[in-house]
From Swiss-Prot:
Protein name: UDP-N-acetylmuramate--L-alanine ligase
Pathway it works in: Cell wall biogenesis; peptidoglycan biosynthesis
Major localization listed first in the record, in broad terms: cytoplasm
Cellular component terms per the entry's GO annotation: cytoplasm
Keyword Nucleotide-binding belongs to the record: yes
Highest classification ranks of the organism: Bacteria, Bacillati, Actinomycetota, Actinomycetes, Mycobacteriales
Species annotation: Corynebacterium glutamicum (strain R)
Role according to the record: Cell wall formation.
GO BP terms, alphabetized: cell division; cell wall organization; peptidoglycan biosynthetic process; regulation of cell shape
MF GO annotations: ATP binding; UDP-N-acetylmuramate-L-alanine ligase activity
Amino acids binding ATP: G126, T127, H128, G129, K130, T131, S132
Catalytic activity: UDP-N-acetyl-alpha-D-muramate + L-alanine + ATP = UDP-N-acetyl-alpha-D-muramoyl-L-alanine + ADP + phosphate + H(+)
HAMAP family named among the record's database cross-references: MurC
Coiled coil region boundaries: none
Length: 486
């Protein structure tokens, strides 16, 4: 668990900020907030993307490609350079020049920590569900008239943005554990949705991964609260340990989970949930007040995320009824069970195409279970998935679990591994997953052939999901077009 040389974020001058990888989900969000606060923002990214256009429109100067001269995009050198060390190599020419010029280089998490200062900080952490829970919290608090600032890892469908500099006191953000970045923050409210070993390429052992959440809980302000999901064993255990340490801790979850963990005071209990035509109707008791909310996004995991969002909003002064109104209006986040379209007429009539970021077995299980619930409620159709594994290390670590999770679908097409920052590993391909699956599955290493493979498998009223953290998202519109015109 090592990090490259980075400078301390203390006393950093944020008047001119250069962001390497500005098009990324996290970087683009902090760029928006800097611009809204009147800072000079420059940046670079390896390729042009739809993320860069709105940043340029509000004042950012951005170069495509990395070069030493990019540090002078504003006409003078920046006062600080921001990078994500997991994604940006240390020989990046902009990093090299920054160090030659003596310009401080900090992580994106350090910058976010600076932006959070002076706010009532609501930080959402956990192995899964951070983006959805953060987004739900934002929409709920906006409806309650709180106008929070926020920085999330996905684009809110309704707002069309991933960040906002609000007029209210609250700042809501994701707390990323993948490189221990969450230890940069001092939350007033810290939500932990779940804890399950991941990012072992960085942490090396599950124990080290678990420890970072304990350390995060220890950074909560004296009058703050830790909020844990009691349906998740490791999050519940974190809550119990925190209670014993004297950290103010509350829990949320279904009634049976609340009963199973009496040591953690429950402040949000899911009394009941059921699938209805509009989505999922849930009855939730928030600190003695029973409310009913309809969630448009399916799945038991989304009900838990919704309960967490309501509780977070309540703990920072939001009116429960108004928070519920906002949550009922939540239409999702880009790449989280995102609807791309449905087929009208022809042999695939009624088939619907969705895209999801799920890239861990637990996330895959949750999304496919939600899709299966929707198919069951409709009384027709099947669940078809096109899955692209993400990272060789994760594929090796969880090959058995991926096979089991994907087998919740009725049929699957599995693409080759998206390596991202990792180099290929001898003997490791997606076939170590497909060989263990128990449903009809096609291993398709040819990316461009996937829409055709799906057309050979899909039928009317099916839910077709593209799934993964890599380039598979590009296939959703292509599959829609293939089925519509087949």
């Amino acid at each position: 668990m090592t990090t490259p040389h980075l400078d301390s974020a203390q006393d950093i001058d944020l008047s001119r900020v250069h962001l390497i990888g500005i098009g990324g989900a996290g970087m683009s969000g902090v760029a928006r907030i800097l611009l809204a606060r009147g800072k000079t923002v420059t940046g670079s990214d390896a390729k042009d993307s739809r993320t860069l256009l709105p940043l340029r429109a509000v004042g950012a100067t951005i170069a495509v490609g990395h070069a030493a001269e990019n540090l002078e995009l504003s006409g003078e050198l920046p006062t600080v350079v921001v990078t994500s060390f997991a994604a940006i190599p240390q020989d990046n020419p902009e990093l090299v020049r920054a160090r030659e010029e003596g310009i401080p280089v900090i992580r994106r998490s350090d910058l976010l920590g600076e932006l959070l200062e002076g706010s009532t900080q609501v930080l959402i952490a956990g192995t899964h569900g951070k983006t959805s829970t953060t987004s739900m919290s934002v929409v709920a608090m906006q409806a309650a008239g709180m106008d929070p600032s926020f920085a999330i890892g996905g684009q809110l469908n309704k707002a069309g943005t991933n960040a906002h500099h609000g007029t209210g006191e609250v700042f809501i953000a994701e707390a990323d554990e993948s490189d221990a970045s969450l230890l940069r923050y001092k939350p007033n409210v810290a939500v932990v949705t779940n804890v399950e070993p991941d990012h072992l390429d960085f942490f090396k052992t599950p124990e080290a991964y678990f420890q970072v959440f304990d350390d995060f809980a220890g950074r909560i302000t004296p009058n703050g609260k830790l909020v844990v999901c009691l349906n998740d064993p490791h999050a519940a255990e974190l809550g119990e340990r925190s209670v014993r340490k004297g950290i103010k801790t509350v829990g949320y979850g279904t009634a049976d989970a609340v009963q199973a963990h009496p040591e953690v005071p429950a402040m949000a209990t899911i009394v009941d949930s059921q699938v209805v035509a509009e989505g999922t109707r849930a009855t939730i008791n928030i600190d003695g007040q029973e409310v009913s909310v309809i969630l448009q996004i399916p799945g038991d995991h989304m009900v838990l995320n919704g309960a967490a969002a309501l509780l977070a909003g309540y703990l920072v002064g939001g009116d429960v009824d108004k928070l519920v109104e906002g949550l009922s209006d939540f239409s999702g986040v880009r790449r989280r069970f995102e609807f791309h379209g449905a087929i009208e007429g022809g042999k695939f009539n009624g088939a619907a195409i969705y895209d999801d970021y799920a890239h861990h077995p637990t996330e895959v299980t949750a999304v496919l279970s939600a899709a299966r619930t929707r198919v069951k409620a409709a009384g027709k159709g099947r669940v078809i998935v096109a899955f692209q594994p993400h990272l060789y290390s994760r594929t090796m670590e969880f090959q058995k679990e991926f096979a089991e999770a994907l087998s919740l679908a009725d049929a699957a097409v599995v693409l080759e591994i998206y390596g991202a920052r990792e180099q290929p590993v001898d003997g490791v391909s997606s076939e170590i997953i497909t060989d263990a699956m128990t449903i009809p599955v096609v291993y398709e290493p040819n990316f461009s052939a996937v829409p055709e493979r799906i057309a050979e498998i899909a039928g009317p009223n099916d839910i077709v999901l593209t799934m993964g953290a890599g380039s598979v998202t590009m296939l959703a519109p292509e599959i829609l077009d293939q089925l519509q015109n087949n």
